[in-house]
Amino acid sequence: FTIDEQLYETLANDQAFYLRAEPLRHPLIFYLGHTAVFYVNKLIVAKVIEERINPHYEALFSIGVDEMSWDDLNDDNYDWPSVAEVKAYRDQVRAMVDHVIETLPLALPIDWDNPFWAIMMGIEHSRIHLETSSVIIRRLPLDQVRPLPLWEICEESGVAPQNQLLSV
């Protein structure tokens, strides 16, 4: 949760969350909510929790896009909540996930029949979106982002190495 939120601190203002930097993706407000919703939805399916935190958000932020023409990217079809509301929701989800991690009996191995599998999926899913969201943020106009020490600019450059195919 923390590193996701630190990534979004690079946005200069709340309006940046609602810009569509990548035409085939939702605005960043979706991804801020999506990674938290993923935990809730997976923990419900795994029968680790029984009640949703915010059923409206858990529908709104559940399904992303696959860069296909039939994906719903019409902004008129979405009434995105405020950044503060989504952050408050994330805080609730984080408290619930922390409680699950602290109280759910851990049995090894963690495979897909293990309730902890949903937590592992949530962690992996968040890491994937950390990467994709960082790419979307890099496509924003420069006045919509700000530098932060955690996300230093890479000063290294050079010629790309020559790749070669290896026999397998």
Role assignments for model-derived ranges:
Residues E9, Q15-S69, L106-L166:
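Short, contiguous alpha-helical
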Residues I63-L108, W117-M121:
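Acidic/histidine-rich alpha-helical segments that form the ligand environment
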